[in-house]
Amino acid sequence: MQNRRDFLKTAAFAAIGSGLTIRQALAAETVPTTFSINRLGKGGKMKMTFFPYELKLKHVFTVASYSRSTTPDVQVEIEYEGVTGYGEASMPPYLGQTVDTVMAFLKKVNLEQFDDPFQLDDILTYVDSISPGDTAAKAAVDIALHDLVGKLLGAPWYKIWGLTKEKAPSTTFTIGIDTPEVMREKTLEVAGQFNILKVKLGRENDKEMIQTIRSVSNLPIAIDANQGWKDKHHALDMIHWLKEQGIVMIEQPMPKEQLDDTAWVTQQSPLPIFADESLQRLCDVAALRGAFNGINIKLMKCTGMREAWKMLTLARALDMRVMIGCMTETSCACSAAAQLSPAVDFADLDGNLLISNDRFRGMEVVKGKITLSDLPGIGVTKI
């Protein structure tokens, strides 16, 4: 026979799985009036606070279109009945979002109108309706709310989703564009810690970069061309050459506007082709089938964990492969993304490893593999 606490948790899990609110899930049962269930949606208000936080990179980060040594970020906390959920918005340049736009958006969010934090769909539908964009700001609220709800349930989200943490894959570690000497140093520094590398290409010296890495490591490599190859014939020639160098997948080989050219490349490619810049939200997934073999889901682009889970589910239904990625982020957002990792083919969750001022301890990389804890919510603690 269940005790009261176990009953409430069971009701909460049932509510999330069925789309009911906690109040609806509890409606058919008689709960003693002397038993407090404030933490499961019978009173109290959610309070959200947020503040800017600049992420400092350990090394200058260079891709095909820019270089940077910091990344703007906004930290979010949602408190309910003494329990706090954490989230964040990370804003690399290409997102087109800034600290000012994120702060302005968050000031419009009124969570106090909701009594039940388990009303995830209602709350996040409301948050999404505030503006057509602001995906990173929306993701910050989504992550914090998922962390809060998971903590109230006493379970990590991978368990709530029915996943097994042992199935989490290895994560890639990104080697940014740099001089040959620096790239060799970076590769040697991490080669013994990771099982697969990721290399940013899309410049004239692409082959030289791969040869530089191959001079010191034979690890499998995932390639992110960052839309850098403009001609489809050049892109296909590069992919054939890269396959001979032990590359295992290609991400966004061509500009997102060149979908037909990308489809031509994908249909003839000996390696799987994944969408990154061509993909943002759930509504984009179906249109990419045929043009790409898979998709790279990033919380900062898709508004968070709720939509990421839907995108993953749809991609699987369309027989597409899935990668879970990240921006330069603290362990907060990386750990949130990692909750989905047992269900994906590839993971690129090294954003927290690229910064020197992480605020959290969360997902770990052990012998190159994503290792999830049993901590509830998104599995993080503040440092």
Q: Can you describe what each PLM-predicted range is?
A:
Residues 1-3:
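N-terminal secretory signal peptides
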Residues 39-50, 66, 79, 84-152:
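Metal- or metallocofactor-binding catalytic centers and their adjacent structured scaffolds
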Residues 257-262, 268, 274, 278-349:
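Catalytic alpha/beta core domains of metabolic enzymes, predominantly
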